[in-house]
Protein backbone atom coordinates (compact mmCIF):
# COMPACT_ATOMS: atom_id res chain seq x y z
CA UNK A 1 0.00 0.00 0.00
CA UNK A 2 2.87 2.38 0.87
CA UNK A 3 4.48 1.70 -2.52
CA UNK A 4 1.20 2.45 -4.31
CA UNK A 5 0.74 5.62 -2.27
CA UNK A 6 4.20 6.85 -3.19
CA UNK A 7 4.49 5.59 -6.78
CA UNK A 8 1.03 5.62 -8.39
CA UNK A 9 0.76 8.80 -10.55
CA UNK A 10 -2.56 9.94 -8.99
CA UNK A 11 -1.98 8.68 -5.45
CA UNK A 12 1.44 10.35 -5.46
CA UNK A 13 -0.18 13.79 -5.92
CA UNK A 14 -2.64 13.10 -3.07
CA UNK A 15 0.21 11.77 -0.91
CA UNK A 16 2.38 14.86 -1.43
CA UNK A 17 -0.58 17.18 -0.79
CA UNK A 18 -2.39 15.60 2.16
CA UNK A 19 -0.37 12.74 3.71
CA UNK A 20 3.42 13.14 3.64
CA UNK A 21 3.25 16.93 3.28
CA UNK A 22 5.88 18.48 5.60
CA UNK A 23 3.95 20.93 7.81
CA UNK A 24 5.15 23.34 10.53
CA UNK A 25 4.66 21.73 13.95
CA UNK A 26 3.25 24.89 15.55
CA UNK A 27 0.39 26.01 13.27
CA UNK A 28 -2.68 26.91 15.32
CA UNK A 29 -6.42 26.46 14.79
CA UNK A 30 -6.38 29.61 12.59
CA UNK A 31 -4.86 27.36 9.90
CA UNK A 32 -7.99 25.14 9.95
CA UNK A 33 -10.04 27.52 7.82
CA UNK A 34 -8.44 26.52 4.51
CA UNK A 35 -9.71 22.95 4.87
CA UNK A 36 -13.04 24.23 6.24
CA UNK A 37 -13.43 26.33 3.08
CA UNK A 38 -12.86 23.15 1.07
CA UNK A 39 -15.63 21.47 3.08
CA UNK A 40 -17.96 24.46 2.53
CA UNK A 41 -17.29 24.38 -1.23
CA UNK A 42 -18.06 20.64 -1.29
CA UNK A 43 -21.33 21.14 0.64
CA UNK A 44 -22.34 24.01 -1.69
CA UNK A 45 -21.62 22.04 -4.88
CA UNK A 46 -23.49 18.91 -3.69
CA UNK A 47 -26.55 20.74 -2.28
CA UNK A 48 -26.55 23.09 -5.29
CA UNK A 49 -26.57 20.15 -7.68
CA UNK A 50 -29.67 18.66 -6.02
CA UNK A 51 -31.39 22.06 -5.96
CA UNK A 52 -30.65 22.57 -9.68
CA UNK A 53 -32.51 19.31 -10.42
CA UNK A 54 -35.77 20.91 -9.23
CA UNK A 55 -35.21 24.64 -9.85
CA UNK A 56 -36.52 26.42 -12.97
CA UNK A 57 -34.79 29.62 -14.09
CA UNK A 58 -37.89 31.35 -15.42
CA UNK A 59 -39.37 34.53 -13.91
CA UNK A 60 -42.85 33.00 -13.85
CA UNK A 61 -41.88 29.77 -12.06
CA UNK A 62 -38.58 30.45 -10.19
CA UNK A 63 -40.21 31.54 -6.92
CA UNK A 64 -42.75 28.70 -6.93
CA UNK A 65 -40.05 26.15 -7.85
CA UNK A 66 -38.14 27.09 -4.67
CA UNK A 67 -41.39 26.75 -2.69
CA UNK A 68 -41.95 23.37 -4.39
CA UNK A 69 -38.43 22.25 -3.32
CA UNK A 70 -39.20 23.12 0.31
CA UNK A 71 -42.70 21.61 0.39
CA UNK A 72 -42.83 18.67 -2.02
CA UNK A 73 -39.30 17.37 -2.61
CA UNK A 74 -38.04 14.72 -0.16
CA UNK A 75 -35.77 16.56 2.29
CA UNK A 76 -35.83 19.53 -0.11
CA UNK A 77 -36.20 21.97 2.79
CA UNK A 78 -32.96 20.82 4.45
CA UNK A 79 -31.06 20.87 1.12
CA UNK A 80 -32.30 24.41 0.43
CA UNK A 81 -31.40 25.71 3.91
CA UNK A 82 -28.04 23.89 3.95
CA UNK A 83 -27.24 25.69 0.70
CA UNK A 84 -28.43 29.12 1.89
CA UNK A 85 -26.77 28.94 5.32
CA UNK A 86 -23.77 27.08 3.88
CA UNK A 87 -23.04 30.31 1.99
CA UNK A 88 -22.96 32.21 5.29
CA UNK A 89 -20.58 29.64 6.78
CA UNK A 90 -18.46 29.89 3.63
CA UNK A 91 -18.08 33.65 4.11
CA UNK A 92 -17.40 33.38 7.86
CA UNK A 93 -14.56 30.96 7.07
CA UNK A 94 -13.38 33.19 4.20
CA UNK A 95 -13.19 36.32 6.36
CA UNK A 96 -11.36 34.43 9.14
CA UNK A 97 -8.99 32.89 6.56
CA UNK A 98 -8.15 36.31 5.06
CA UNK A 99 -7.87 37.83 8.56
CA UNK A 100 -5.42 35.08 9.53
CA UNK A 101 -3.40 35.85 6.39
CA UNK A 102 -3.19 39.55 7.30
CA UNK A 103 -2.36 38.94 10.98
CA UNK A 104 0.38 36.38 10.39
CA UNK A 105 1.82 37.97 7.22
CA UNK A 106 0.84 35.11 4.90
CA UNK A 107 0.40 37.69 2.10
CA UNK A 108 4.18 37.59 1.55
CA UNK A 109 3.51 34.40 -0.45
CA UNK A 110 2.33 36.69 -3.24
CA UNK A 111 1.24 34.04 -5.79
CA UNK A 112 -0.89 32.16 -3.25
CA UNK A 113 -2.27 35.47 -1.93
CA UNK A 114 -3.20 36.80 -5.39
CA UNK A 115 -4.97 33.57 -6.38
CA UNK A 116 -6.80 33.88 -3.04
CA UNK A 117 -8.01 37.38 -4.00
CA UNK A 118 -9.31 36.01 -7.34
CA UNK A 119 -11.06 33.27 -5.35
CA UNK A 120 -12.64 35.87 -3.04
CA UNK A 121 -14.00 37.85 -6.02
CA UNK A 122 -15.27 34.63 -7.66
CA UNK A 123 -17.05 33.48 -4.48
CA UNK A 124 -18.61 36.93 -4.02
CA UNK A 125 -19.86 36.92 -7.64
CA UNK A 126 -21.28 33.40 -7.20
CA UNK A 127 -23.05 34.32 -3.94
CA UNK A 128 -24.53 37.48 -5.48
CA UNK A 129 -25.94 35.57 -8.46
CA UNK A 130 -27.23 32.82 -6.18
CA UNK A 131 -29.15 35.40 -4.13
CA UNK A 132 -31.00 36.48 -7.29
CA UNK A 133 -32.24 32.96 -8.15
CA UNK A 134 -35.16 32.55 -5.66
CA UNK A 135 -36.71 35.61 -7.41
CA UNK A 136 -38.06 37.22 -4.25
CA UNK A 137 -38.33 40.98 -3.73
CA UNK A 138 -34.77 41.37 -2.41
CA UNK A 139 -33.46 39.09 -5.19
CA UNK A 140 -34.96 41.29 -7.89
CA UNK A 141 -34.14 44.67 -6.37
CA UNK A 142 -30.69 43.57 -5.23
CA UNK A 143 -29.92 42.46 -8.80
CA UNK A 144 -31.29 45.75 -10.19
CA UNK A 145 -29.32 47.98 -7.81
CA UNK A 146 -25.98 46.12 -7.93
CA UNK A 147 -25.90 45.58 -11.72
CA UNK A 148 -26.95 49.22 -12.19
CA UNK A 149 -23.69 50.29 -10.50
CA UNK A 150 -21.87 49.35 -13.71
CA UNK A 151 -23.66 52.25 -15.45
CA UNK A 152 -21.24 54.52 -13.54
CA UNK A 153 -18.45 53.38 -15.89
CA UNK A 154 -17.86 56.28 -18.31
CA UNK A 155 -19.00 55.94 -21.94
CA UNK A 156 -19.76 52.18 -22.01
CA UNK A 157 -21.65 51.94 -18.68
CA UNK A 158 -25.28 52.00 -19.90
CA UNK A 159 -24.61 49.61 -22.80
CA UNK A 160 -22.74 47.27 -20.46
CA UNK A 161 -25.65 47.13 -17.98
CA UNK A 162 -28.19 46.40 -20.74
CA UNK A 163 -25.86 43.74 -22.15
CA UNK A 164 -25.68 42.03 -18.72
CA UNK A 165 -29.46 42.34 -18.24
CA UNK A 166 -30.18 41.00 -21.75
CA UNK A 167 -32.79 43.74 -22.13
CA UNK A 168 -33.88 47.06 -20.67
CA UNK A 169 -34.47 45.73 -17.16
CA UNK A 170 -33.74 42.72 -14.93
CA UNK A 171 -35.97 40.04 -16.45
CA UNK A 172 -36.12 36.44 -17.72
CA UNK A 173 -32.86 36.71 -19.70
CA UNK A 174 -31.03 38.01 -16.62
CA UNK A 175 -32.33 35.22 -14.39
CA UNK A 176 -31.43 32.50 -16.93
CA UNK A 177 -27.86 33.72 -17.41
CA UNK A 178 -27.37 34.24 -13.66
CA UNK A 179 -28.42 30.62 -13.10
CA UNK A 180 -25.98 29.43 -15.78
CA UNK A 181 -23.11 31.42 -14.24
CA UNK A 182 -24.08 30.43 -10.70
CA UNK A 183 -23.90 26.78 -11.76
CA UNK A 184 -20.53 26.95 -13.57
CA UNK A 185 -18.60 29.30 -11.23
CA UNK A 186 -18.18 26.83 -8.30
CA UNK A 187 -16.33 24.46 -10.64
CA UNK A 188 -14.07 27.33 -11.76
CA UNK A 189 -13.56 28.10 -8.04
CA UNK A 190 -12.62 24.44 -7.43
CA UNK A 191 -10.02 24.68 -10.22
CA UNK A 192 -8.64 27.93 -8.74
CA UNK A 193 -8.43 26.19 -5.34
CA UNK A 194 -6.14 23.58 -6.93
CA UNK A 195 -3.90 26.38 -8.24
CA UNK A 196 -4.03 28.07 -4.81
CA UNK A 197 -2.82 24.83 -3.16
CA UNK A 198 -0.22 24.27 -5.88
CA UNK A 199 1.40 27.64 -5.14
CA UNK A 200 1.08 27.08 -1.36
CA UNK A 201 2.89 23.74 -1.58
CA UNK A 202 5.70 25.39 -3.57
CA UNK A 203 6.63 27.42 -0.47
CA UNK A 204 5.10 25.42 2.38
CA UNK A 205 2.78 26.82 5.04
CA UNK A 206 3.52 29.90 7.10
CA UNK A 207 3.30 29.57 10.92
CA UNK A 208 2.25 31.88 13.80
CA UNK A 209 5.80 33.10 14.48
CA UNK A 210 6.44 33.99 10.83
CA UNK A 211 9.87 32.37 11.16
CA UNK A 212 11.09 29.79 8.59
CA UNK A 213 10.21 26.37 10.02
CA UNK A 214 12.21 24.04 7.73
CA UNK A 215 14.07 22.62 10.75
CA UNK A 216 10.84 21.63 12.52
CA UNK A 217 8.34 19.93 10.23
CA UNK A 218 5.88 17.08 10.88
CA UNK A 219 3.82 15.01 8.39
CA UNK A 220 0.34 16.36 7.62
CA UNK A 221 -1.21 12.94 8.35
CA UNK A 222 -2.13 11.99 11.07
CA UNK A 223 -1.49 15.23 13.00
CA UNK A 224 -3.36 17.76 10.89
CA UNK A 225 -5.89 15.39 9.33
CA UNK A 226 -7.20 14.75 12.87
CA UNK A 227 -7.08 18.47 13.65
CA UNK A 228 -9.01 19.26 10.43
CA UNK A 229 -11.53 16.49 11.23
CA UNK A 230 -12.31 18.24 14.54
CA UNK A 231 -12.81 21.50 12.60
CA UNK A 232 -15.17 19.69 10.19
CA UNK A 233 -17.17 18.34 13.14
CA UNK A 234 -17.50 21.77 14.77
CA UNK A 235 -18.45 23.50 11.49
CA UNK A 236 -21.08 20.90 10.54
CA UNK A 237 -22.51 21.07 14.09
CA UNK A 238 -22.78 24.86 13.83
CA UNK A 239 -24.28 24.69 10.33
CA UNK A 240 -26.84 22.01 11.28
CA UNK A 241 -27.79 23.93 14.44
CA UNK A 242 -28.46 27.01 12.30
CA UNK A 243 -30.36 25.05 9.62
CA UNK A 244 -32.51 23.04 12.05
CA UNK A 245 -33.29 25.71 14.66
CA UNK A 246 -33.35 29.07 12.86
CA UNK A 247 -32.82 28.65 9.12
CA UNK A 248 -34.08 32.17 8.29
CA UNK A 249 -31.97 33.97 10.89
CA UNK A 250 -29.51 35.38 8.34
CA UNK A 251 -31.99 35.84 5.49
CA UNK A 252 -34.27 38.75 4.59
CA UNK A 253 -38.04 38.46 5.17
CA UNK A 254 -38.63 40.46 1.95
CA UNK A 255 -37.34 37.50 -0.05
CA UNK A 256 -40.44 35.52 0.90
CA UNK A 257 -42.45 37.96 -1.23
CA UNK A 258 -42.36 37.20 -4.99
CA UNK A 259 -40.45 39.74 -7.09
CA UNK A 260 -42.55 42.74 -8.10
CA UNK A 261 -40.95 45.41 -10.33
CA UNK A 262 -43.75 47.86 -9.39
CA UNK A 263 -43.14 47.74 -5.64
CA UNK A 264 -39.77 48.78 -4.17
CA UNK A 265 -38.87 47.44 -0.68
CA UNK A 266 -38.20 50.20 1.91
CA UNK A 267 -34.58 49.10 2.50
CA UNK A 268 -32.74 47.38 -0.34
CA UNK A 269 -29.75 45.55 1.11
CA UNK A 270 -27.63 42.54 0.12
CA UNK A 271 -26.87 39.47 2.26
CA UNK A 272 -25.06 40.18 5.55
CA UNK A 273 -21.63 39.16 4.21
CA UNK A 274 -21.69 41.99 1.63
CA UNK A 275 -22.88 44.70 4.02
CA UNK A 276 -19.39 46.04 4.83
CA UNK A 277 -18.70 46.66 1.11
CA UNK A 278 -22.24 48.04 0.62
CA UNK A 279 -21.65 50.52 3.47
CA UNK A 280 -18.41 51.69 1.81
CA UNK A 281 -20.30 52.08 -1.50
CA UNK A 282 -23.05 54.17 0.13
CA UNK A 283 -20.64 56.35 2.12
CA UNK A 284 -19.48 58.18 -1.04
CA UNK A 285 -22.14 60.52 -2.54
CA UNK A 286 -20.70 60.21 -6.08
CA UNK A 287 -21.83 57.09 -8.00
CA UNK A 288 -18.52 56.37 -9.78
CA UNK A 289 -16.55 57.16 -6.61
CA UNK A 290 -18.73 54.74 -4.65
CA UNK A 291 -18.22 51.94 -7.19
CA UNK A 292 -14.43 52.51 -7.16
CA UNK A 293 -14.40 52.43 -3.33
CA UNK A 294 -16.47 49.23 -3.40
CA UNK A 295 -14.01 47.46 -5.73
CA UNK A 296 -10.97 48.87 -3.89
CA UNK A 297 -12.30 47.66 -0.52
CA UNK A 298 -11.44 44.11 -1.70
CA UNK A 299 -8.76 44.86 -4.33
CA UNK A 300 -6.70 46.71 -1.67
CA UNK A 301 -5.71 43.25 -0.42
CA UNK A 302 -3.57 42.88 -3.58
CA UNK A 303 -1.20 45.68 -2.50
CA UNK A 304 -0.77 44.35 1.04
CA UNK A 305 2.61 42.73 0.23
CA UNK A 306 3.82 46.17 -0.97
CA UNK A 307 2.63 47.84 2.25
CA UNK A 308 4.55 45.40 4.47
CA UNK A 309 7.27 47.60 6.01
CA UNK A 310 8.00 45.52 9.13
CA UNK A 311 11.20 43.53 9.62
CA UNK A 312 9.05 40.78 11.12
CA UNK A 313 6.57 38.80 9.06
CA UNK A 314 3.93 38.00 11.68
CA UNK A 315 2.13 40.33 14.09
CA UNK A 316 2.74 37.82 16.90
CA UNK A 317 5.54 39.94 18.42
CA UNK A 318 4.18 43.36 17.36
CA UNK A 319 1.66 44.62 19.94
CA UNK A 320 1.06 48.03 18.29
CA UNK A 321 0.26 46.39 14.93
CA UNK A 322 -1.98 43.92 16.77
CA UNK A 323 -3.95 46.82 18.25
CA UNK A 324 -4.43 48.36 14.79
CA UNK A 325 -5.45 44.97 13.37
CA UNK A 326 -8.21 44.58 15.98
CA UNK A 327 -9.32 48.18 15.35
CA UNK A 328 -9.63 47.16 11.67
CA UNK A 329 -11.77 44.15 12.68
CA UNK A 330 -14.00 46.40 14.83
CA UNK A 331 -14.23 48.86 11.92
CA UNK A 332 -15.38 46.10 9.55
CA UNK A 333 -18.02 44.99 12.07
CA UNK A 334 -19.19 48.63 12.31
CA UNK A 335 -19.41 48.83 8.50
CA UNK A 336 -21.41 45.56 8.44
CA UNK A 337 -23.87 47.06 10.94
CA UNK A 338 -24.11 50.36 9.02
CA UNK A 339 -24.73 48.54 5.71
CA UNK A 340 -27.96 47.15 7.14
CA UNK A 341 -29.23 50.51 8.42
CA UNK A 342 -31.33 53.07 6.47
CA UNK A 343 -29.57 56.04 4.83
CA UNK A 344 -30.27 58.68 7.50
CA UNK A 345 -28.55 60.54 10.32
CA UNK A 346 -26.48 59.37 12.27
CA UNK A 347 -25.78 56.27 10.12
CA UNK A 348 -24.51 58.31 7.14
CA UNK A 349 -21.70 60.02 9.07
CA UNK A 350 -20.79 56.82 10.99
CA UNK A 351 -20.51 54.97 7.65
CA UNK A 352 -18.34 57.71 6.14
CA UNK A 353 -16.00 57.77 9.15
CA UNK A 354 -15.76 53.96 9.25
CA UNK A 355 -15.03 53.82 5.48
CA UNK A 356 -12.34 56.50 5.82
CA UNK A 357 -10.80 54.66 8.79
CA UNK A 358 -10.78 51.36 6.85
CA UNK A 359 -8.60 52.77 4.05
CA UNK A 360 -6.54 54.91 6.46
CA UNK A 361 -5.66 51.86 8.59
CA UNK A 362 -4.55 49.70 5.67
CA UNK A 363 -2.80 52.35 3.56
CA UNK A 364 -1.24 54.61 6.21
CA UNK A 365 -1.47 53.62 9.88
CA UNK A 366 -0.40 49.97 9.66
CA UNK A 367 2.69 50.57 7.42
CA UNK A 368 3.77 53.60 9.54
CA UNK A 369 3.23 51.62 12.73
CA UNK A 370 5.47 48.83 11.36
CA UNK A 371 8.25 51.37 10.71
CA UNK A 372 7.93 52.66 14.30
CA UNK A 373 8.17 49.06 15.59
CA UNK A 374 11.33 48.57 13.52
CA UNK A 375 12.86 51.56 15.34
CA UNK A 376 11.73 50.18 18.72
CA UNK A 377 13.57 46.91 17.97
CA UNK A 378 16.88 48.79 18.09
CA UNK A 379 16.30 50.19 21.60
From Swiss-Prot:
Q: Give the matching Pfam families.
A: Cytochrom_B_C, Cytochrome_B
Q: Where in the cell is it found?
A: Mitochondrion inner membrane
Where along this sequence does the record place binding of a ubiquinone? 201
| Classification via SUPFAM superfamilies | a domain/subunit of cytochrome bc1 complex (Ubiquinol-cytochrome c reductase) (SSF81648), Transmembrane di-heme cytochromes (SSF81342)
Q: Where does heme b b562 bind?
A: 83, 182
Q: How does it sit in the membrane?
A: Multi-pass membrane protein
**What does the cofactor section's free text say about binding?**
Binds 2 heme b groups non-covalently.
Q: Name one GO cellular component term.
A: respiratory chain complex III
Q: Which PROSITE patterns does this one have?
A: CYTB_CTER, CYTB_NTER
What family does this chain come from, according to its entry?
Belongs to the cytochrome b family.
Record function comment:
Component of the ubiquinol-cytochrome c reductase complex (complex III or cytochrome b-c1 complex) that is part of the mitochondrial respiratory chain. The b-c1 complex mediates electron transfer from ubiquinol to cytochrome c. Contributes to the generation of a proton gradient across the mitochondrial membrane that is then used for ATP synthesis.
What is the recorded name of this protein?
A: Cytochrome b
- Gene that encodes the chain: MT-CYB
Amino acid sequence: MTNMRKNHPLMKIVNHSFIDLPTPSNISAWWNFGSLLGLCLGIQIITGLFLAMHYTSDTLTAFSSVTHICRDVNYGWIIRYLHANGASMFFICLFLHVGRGIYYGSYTYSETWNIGIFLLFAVMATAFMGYVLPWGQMSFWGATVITNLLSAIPYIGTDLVQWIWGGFSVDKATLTRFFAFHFILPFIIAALVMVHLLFLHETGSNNPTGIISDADKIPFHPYYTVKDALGFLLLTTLLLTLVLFSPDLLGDPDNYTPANPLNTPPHIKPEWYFLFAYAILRSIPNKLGGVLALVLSIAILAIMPLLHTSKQRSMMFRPISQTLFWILVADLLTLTWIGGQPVEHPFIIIGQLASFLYFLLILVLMPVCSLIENKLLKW
